[in-house]
Amino acid sequence: VGDTPGFLVNLGGTAIGTEGLRIMQEGRATPSQIDAVMRDSCGFRMGPFELMDLTGIDVNFPARKIIYEGFFHDRRMTPSPYHESLYAAGRLGRKTGGGWYAYDAKGAKVDPGADHPTSTVPASSVVIMDTHNKKLVGLIAADGAKMLGADDGKSPILVAPIGKDCTTTAIELGLDPKRTIAVDLTGDTAKRLTIMTAPGAD
């Protein structure tokens, strides 16, 4: 391993932590939701916020700053002000009884918060833009919804983008962003299905 800012493990986990913090900072998901997705869909033992609390905010926030500065402020490694605020407040994770989560004297989480949204009534029909996507078609078939190959102007429109958000995908495909739902099929969908909508979606 060559000489580089941060230990190898810090660099390996940088993307997971910084992306998790960015998603939370943008209000897309809570720490408990992000951690649950990483555990259930990606096979990790714990998510980025659980890991930060375990190792200690007093360890991982300074390390993140060193890596960011060492790579000449590469924007992909930008620290989060929320991370810094926990550090400044002395909420250092399990060792202080609170970080991203609150902990009891034994180190167990106290009311971690819901890791999934409240259930809603499923749609009776959906529009699938890529009917050749066997995984997406299989999920809808298992749910019992009627699959439409063309837009009827009122049903939810399902897409399965990789590396793009819901809004960008809807615009590129000429779809109604208010009815478009992006489904993440890159991970394990047996325990959890992660979806994304555009701002202002119905």
Model-derived features with residue positions:
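Acidic, glycine/proline-rich low-complexity segments that act as flexible tails and inter-domain linkers
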Residues: L193-T194
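Catalytic alpha/beta core domains of metabolic enzymes, predominantly
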Residues: T197-A198
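NAD(P)-dependent Rossmann-like dehydrogenase/reductase catalytic/cofactor-binding core
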Residues: G2-F7, A15, R22-A190, D202
